[in-house]
Amino acid sequence: MARALLIVLDSVGIGGAPDADRYGDAGSDTVGHIAEACAAGRGDRPGLRAGPLRMPNLTALGLGLACEGATGRVPPGLAPDGPVRALWGHAVETAAGKDTPSGHWEIAGVPVREAWGHFPDTQPAFPAELTAALIERAGLPGILGDCHASGTAIIEALGAEHVRTGKPICYTSADSVFQIAAHEEAFGLERLYETCRIAREVCDPYRVGRVIARPFLGSAAEGFRRTSHRKDFSVAPPAGTLLDGLEAAGRAVVSVGKIGDIFAHRATGREIKPAGNAACLDAALDAFAGLPEGGFVFLNLVDFDTEHGHRRDVPGYAAELEAFDARLPEIQAVLKPGDLCVITADHGNDPTWTGTEHTREQVPVLAFGPGLTPRALGRRESFADMGASVAAHLGLPPLGAGQAW
């Protein structure tokens, strides 16, 4: 019986989706623009990296050709040198969102058919009755923010007032999110989580996809900094996912990174949530090495998105891509005959783009394992094709959406 490892490189899009113009994202291209910036010397940072984008292992798996399929061009430095060693293609999202739950749920076989609720880019951004209910139920002295904002910018602007008043910082973005930032010591980490649990209930009637706890530390004098104790409070998928199918079949499942949060901890098996891409990949490889036949490891690597995409940090994003690429031999080494590894993304977050939000993009589809014959997969009309293919590989019944390759 086979095993499978599904790796989501959070926000590593490869070119604007066919409907990107509806989102103001026509022309966005996370990987392509990073490669172009690095080739032009705009990806250099002393002590971090310099020169063209170097991803020899992903290039050998067909990443550059997947980019070409999505945009019509191979990004600088990503043309394969020799035969491609994987199945390669690109996928288009059918869900209306460009957010984390929409992308992951569709990958797992459940496209979001109804639109998420969003808050307007006004101040206040939140309905008065929502704010009043949260303040009353959580016993808060009030809230700060109540607007669209960059998470790092708003804690710098309001962190000192938050510590002084005890009012948490509440903000949103173009995604369907209600985010609450609070100081781990002055406000308390567990109190922040409990406030978010209440906010989750308060936000449900508004079809908000995620409530996110954004803890931070520091002071006005030394500056404030986010910690690794972020926690997402998501709604559950509206139908059975690949994970539910695995649970029903009695298969071993390991969820690494924020996968458990994304799927509201339903059918997510053993959850491991280290801090940072490197530690998450370590945990996934360790879990996969001991995984029984028929098992599944689902990994999200979020630092591309949170540390570099939203911060429009080209050198940091490039270095993160190169660091992952350097570890591909470790991934290949843990695969046994019959195993499948799929590498993809959930949306884009072009660090050369305007603003600080996600970008509506196509995503790479790279699949490999001992004994798999490399070939072009072309354009996949739904992210759900990946979940369908993993289900077929593991001998599960077909999912509700997607076509296996």
From Swiss-Prot:
Keywords, comma-separated and alphabetical: Cytoplasm, Isomerase, Manganese, Metal-binding
Catalytically driven reaction(s): 2-deoxy-alpha-D-ribose 1-phosphate = 2-deoxy-D-ribose 5-phosphate; alpha-D-ribose 1-phosphate = D-ribose 5-phosphate
Binding site for Mn(2+) 2: D305, H310, H358
Any GO BP: 5-phosphoribose 1-diphosphate biosynthetic process
Pathways per UniProt: Carbohydrate degradation; 2-deoxy-D-ribose 1-phosphate degradation; D-glyceraldehyde 3-phosphate and acetaldehyde from 2-deoxy-alpha-D-ribose 1-phosphate: step 1/2
CDD domains from the UniProt entry: PPM
Details of cofactor binding: Binds 2 manganese ions.
One annotated GO molecular function: phosphopentomutase activity
Pfam families: Metalloenzyme
SUPFAM superfamilies according to UniProt: Alkaline phosphatase-like (SSF53649), DeoB insert domain-like (SSF143856)
Binding site for Mn(2+) 1: D10, D346, H347
Superkingdom in the source lineage: Bacteria
Main location: cytoplasm
Enzyme class: isomerase
Cofactor dependence: Mn(2+)
GO cellular component: cytosol
Cellular localization per UniProt: Cytoplasm
Family: Belongs to the phosphopentomutase family.
Function, as annotated: Isomerase that catalyzes the conversion of deoxy-ribose 1-phosphate (dRib-1-P) and ribose 1-phosphate (Rib-1-P) to deoxy-ribose 5-phosphate (dRib-5-P) and ribose 5-phosphate (Rib-5-P), respectively.
NCBIfam families from the UniProt entry: deoB, PRK05362.1
Listed name of the protein: Phosphopentomutase
Source organism: Methylorubrum extorquens (strain CM4 / NCIMB 13688)
This protein's encoding gene: deoB
